[in-house]
């Protein structure tokens, strides 16, 4: 699921070992309510027509931000066009409609029925026929049998899951032996999520969570994925003004190549392979 508010970290982020007890039912209801409200704001003919195509309309910085995530995920997955792809946490289709340009078979799921309904309407409006949108819980993909997909991708979703580990185990269950995972994590070492957002008065999402790269690797490995690798990307926020976007793109190109700098990027992308063992 993709949303605007993020966690404001005045204290170090909770690690797997430090997690406080969570009422998972309450947390999921809160998330569903949030997205139901967001979907209601967009559920109109003007939004369906906006952008002149299936892609969800957003500002240039947001489109660049999403493009970079998807481009990186495609490179890390290294999957052919005929691969069966599952996207978990698709929201209204922000990344989904980019994936449909690459893959012949995309299934996209989200916890929010309202988000899925909106994504379906957008796909129908723009005649995107190679995607199936379904309501599903990332931590319990009960509608899918084992080994259903060649690739599982998830963007801006694990950060909101009560148990990212449980979700990643489900991702592995529905991936075929040899299947690939690519998921993203907001980087706890990025200044944007703490002092910068505080200075801008941006309200945190109550259930958001940040991850250091080592923690993301450990969680993915702990869920049974092998050959786990991470990559730091993006210093550009979706909120960057149009006039500054060119400068921030340059910052990304340079910063992502410098080891001492890239560790402070906004996003940690993680990939893994399902070795088929149970």
Per-region residue spans from a language model:
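Conserved beta-strand signature within the Rossmann-like core of class I S-adenosyl-L-methionine
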Residues: 179-185
């Amino acid at each position: 699921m993709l949303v605007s508010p993020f966690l404001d970290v005045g204290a170090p982020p909770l690690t797997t070992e430090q997690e406080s007890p969570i009422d998972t039912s309450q947390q999921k209801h809160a998330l569903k309510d949030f997205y139901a409200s967001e979907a209601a704001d967009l559920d109109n003919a003007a939004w369906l027509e906006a952008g002149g195509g299936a892609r969800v309309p957003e500002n240039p910085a947001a489109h660049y931000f999403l493009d970079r995530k998807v481009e990186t995920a495609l490179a890390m997955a290294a999957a052919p066009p005929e691969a069966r792809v599952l996207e978990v946490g698709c929201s209204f289709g922000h990344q989904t409609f980019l994936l449909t340009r690459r893959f012949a078979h995309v299934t996209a799921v989200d916890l929010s029925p309202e988000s899925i309904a909106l994504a379906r309407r957008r796909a129908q409006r723009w005649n995107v026929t190679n995607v199936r949108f379904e309501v599903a819980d990332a931590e319990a993909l009960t509608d899918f049998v084992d080994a259903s997909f060649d690739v599982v991708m998830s963007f801006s979703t694990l950060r909101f899951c009560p148990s990212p580990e449980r979700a990643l185990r489900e991702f592995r269950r529905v991936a075929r032996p040899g299947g690939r995972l690519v998921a993203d994590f907001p980087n706890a070492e990025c200044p944007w999520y703490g002092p910068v957002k505080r200075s801008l008065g941006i309200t945190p999402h109550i259930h958001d969570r940040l991850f250091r790269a080592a923690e993301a690797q450990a969680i993915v490995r702990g869920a049974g994925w092998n050959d786990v690798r991470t990559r730091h990307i993006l210093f550009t926020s979706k909120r960057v003004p149009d006039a500054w976007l060119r400068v921030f793109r340059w910052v990304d190109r340079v910063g992502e190549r410098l080891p001492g700098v890239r560790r402070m990027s906004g996003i940690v992308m993680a990939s893994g392979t399902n070795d088929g063992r149970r």
